Amino acid sequence: MSETSRDLELVRTALLDISKEWYPRILPIEEELLVEARKAEVAGRLGRSKSSFALEGWIPTLELPRLRGALQQATGNRHQLIETDEQEGAPTLLRNPAGFSIYEFFIRFYSLPQNSEVDPTLVFALIFPFFFGFMLGDVGYSAFILTVCVWLIWRIGNPRAGPTWTPGFLRKFVTQIVPPHALKQLAKTFVPGCIVGIAFGIAFDSYFGFSLGQLTLGHFNFYLIPPHNGIPGQVVYVAKLLLAAVYIGLGMVTLGLIFGAINKYFHHNVKHVLGKIFWILVAWGITLLGLSLVHHYPGSWLIAYSQYFDIYLAMLAIGAIGVVATEGMLSAIELPSIMSHVLSYARLVGILLASVILAFVINAIAVLGTSSGSGLITHGAVFAVVAVVLVAIGAIFNILIGVIEPGIQGVRLLYVEHFSKFYTGNGRAFSPFGATRKYTRPQLLESHTELRG
């Protein structure tokens, strides 16, 4: 057995020596051959004669001057470039600022927009962190998730940085579900949301479920939504938060319908542009009408008074008639759905309260105490250990909820309630003909001398 092992080691050493000598030489040859093979494949599909050829394709408008310059240099001005205004079937190229382009991951995952559609990436990049941070709403949980996200970004970007503290089975499980590159992209998209979550946590006075006053034994207090008799402010002012969520939903639905009207305008479909405007009237009319019916509730705010009831009813009636007139009788079936889409944004508060109440109950039992007695931590060493473990388990559970639920629900609100108002999708990605060169350089002039001769 030992002799066989030595023979195998000798073979490995010999192969390694061969690899060291020839691998650097083979790589550029392989790369150049792949490039030339792709060129030959395309050339076989061109319309051509002995002295000319015709090539048709898509190119971004901003790249046209560069294309003209390259053709002039390659052919000595012996070419003809014909532009067309035809946009049907054009591929889609997403162009967004660097800070926003990371959210293209979600747009591509859902469906690439068509070339003639509004690109929703900017809206997604602005709204998703707000939704995520609002539902998280705790300084401690947000800071912990932010730290993990920053570490993931660094670690995946530096795979040779040394051993990691994460268990092997956990790494294997995560990478089987989400590839490292996608995990890095997700971590980048969560970072702004965690920062927003820290800001909301300060406003809500929530630090791992405790208030700042509780953590500092009453020396420091800061909040924008005050607690009442030890009950978190998010619970005390739940009616106002729900109302704010409804107005957020109304705004998001309206924005989606405006985008839909813009899309229809670019398709020269005036009838459906009017249809989107009538849908906006329906959304505002039915929402304000419903709120005016409950304006007497003492916990509500920003609610219109009942004397405007007739105006809201007229908005709803005009909008409904207009929708049916522009989109057909079947659209009448969808009229109630507009209200459900607006009310869906109440889940923003629901996710927030689930985390707040869970943390409040666990912290009260373990540390703060309840109306029936003091917390476990005051009942001796054994109970103190139990209290610490209970708080730790609650924090871990809330962190897991804080990653999963705000992420899923934030994306869902944008995909379903917002995108459904304007988004068609099924776009074709712009994939320019070319090659990524790592070991070789293109020889443009030499490869086109026959065109210039």
Where do the PLM segments sit?
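Intrinsically disordered, flexible peripheral segments
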Residues: 1-94, 98, 449-452
